[in-house]
Amino acid sequence: MDYGTILEERTNPAVLMNAREQYMRQCARGDPSAASTFAFAHAMIGSKNKLDVKEGIVCLEKLLRDDEDRTSKRNYVYYLAVAHARIKQYDLALGYIDVLLDAEGDNQQAKTLKESIKSAMTHDGLIGAAIVGGGALALAGLVAIFSMSRK
């Protein structure tokens, strides 16, 4: 599959602005819901602006820490991989997708994303250059989260 299919899709600026406004309204009333936070994060990681993508990553990481639902955690990990790949942090992207594949070895969507990330790395001339060490510490926590949620 062409890496552009997943990694190059972008959020329409109007959708991005609407998601931000809805999220900010909920923040003004207190803690935003997980659904609202996820919708905002999903829109942000599709932005062309690297700072927006990073803001989406922060939201997804918070959701991953705070949400107990296993299916939701799976989605957060998947979209964290997408987000990191979009800002060319391929080591972290592969780390997240590998955690997901360790938990769900038959997950075709995750396998496709992994191939897309590798294709993007090749396209960017970075094959074999991803440094897993920096992401290993952050991902160790994810492994623990998935291990605990299996019990």
Swiss-Prot record:
Q: What are the transmembrane regions?
A: 126-146
Single Gene Ontology MF annotation: lipid binding
A single GO BP term for this record reads: mitochondrial fission
rRNA-binding found in the keyword field: no
UniProt topology in membrane: Single-pass membrane protein
InterPro entries found in the cross-reference section = Fis1 (IPR016543), Fis1_cytosol (IPR033745), Fis1_TPR_C (IPR028061), Fis1_TPR_N (IPR028058), TPR-like_helical_dom_sf (IPR011990)
Q: Which UniProt keywords apply?
A: Apoptosis, Membrane, Mitochondrion, Mitochondrion outer membrane, Peroxisome, Transmembrane, Transmembrane helix
Where is this protein localized, as stated in its record?
A: Mitochondrion outer membrane; Peroxisome membrane; Mitochondrion
Its main localization is mitochondrion
Keyword Membrane recorded:
yes
Q: Which GO terms describe its cellular component?
A: mitochondrial outer membrane; mitochondrion; peroxisomal membrane
Q: Disrupted gene: resulting phenotype?
A: Mitochondrial connectivity appears normal and also normal in a fis-1 mutant background. Abnormal, but minor, affects on apoptosis, with fewer cell corpses and an increase in cell numbers in a caspase ced-3, ced-4, or dynamin GTPase drp-1 mutant background. Increases number of ectopic cells in a combined ced-3 and drp-1 mutant background. Increases number of ectopic cells in a combined ced-3; ced-9 mutant background, which increases further in a ced-3; ced-9; drp-1 mutant background.
Database matches in PANTHER family: MITOCHONDRIAL FISSION 1 PROTEIN, TETRATRICOPEPTIDE REPEAT PROTEIN 11 TPR REPEAT PROTEIN 11
Q: Give the domain note.
A: The C-terminus is required for mitochondrial or peroxisomal localization, while the N-terminus is necessary for mitochondrial or peroxisomal fission.
So what family is this one in? Belongs to the FIS1 family.
Q: What does this protein do?
A: Involved in the fragmentation of the mitochondrial network. Involved in perinuclear clustering of the mitochondrial network. May act, redundantly with fis-1, downstream of mitochondrial fission, before the fission products participate in mitochondrial homeostasis, mitophagy, or apoptosis. Plays a role in apoptosis by promoting mitochondrial elimination and cell-death execution, acting downstream of caspase ced-3, and perhaps independently of dynamin GTPase drp-1, caspase ced-9 and apoptosis-inducing factor AIFM/wah-1.
| Name of this protein | FIS1-related protein fis-2
Origin organism is Caenorhabditis elegans
Q: Which gene encodes it?
A: fis-2
